[in-house]
Amino acid sequence: MKNWFAALLLAVPMSAAVASGGGHYEKVDIDLRDQVSLQHGAQIFTNYCLSCHSASGMRFNRLKDIGLTDEEIKKNLMFTTDNVGDVMHSAMNPKDAAKWFGAAPPDLTLIARSKGADYL
């Protein structure tokens, strides 16, 4: 009984604090001329996000738009395919993802288009 009471005392104030957060996102300042930063972001995305999420609205060869060569893309950013013209699919099987997480992680190109860069 004491444990339930202690849990209740902790849960109520914490839920109120979380609920009052308001879901405010800070404005992201993206400089599309900073190619080094964009290349670093592409590396972060392919190394971490693309493990679970797909980006089926984006092809690897579009990374040439930020100054990368085909060789750099193949060597540093491609892990699931050998064709630079392929779309960015998740390394994870969607059925496994749904089993592990309850739902497959969303495609991030759709999220970026619908909710904007500030959301990501």
Residue spans of the language-model regions?
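Positively charged n-region of N-terminal signal peptides that target proteins for export
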Residues: 1-7
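Bacterial N-terminal signal peptides
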Residues: 7-16
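Electrostatic cytochrome c docking/interface patches
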Residues: 19-43, 54-65, 72-74
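Solvent-exposed, acidic/flexible segments
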Residues: 31-38, 42, 98-101, 113-117
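C-type cytochrome heme c attachment motif
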Residues: 43-54, 94, 104-115
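Structured domain cores in non-transmembrane regions
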Residues: 63-99, 103-105, 111
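Short, conserved charged micro-motifs
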Residues: 68, 116-120
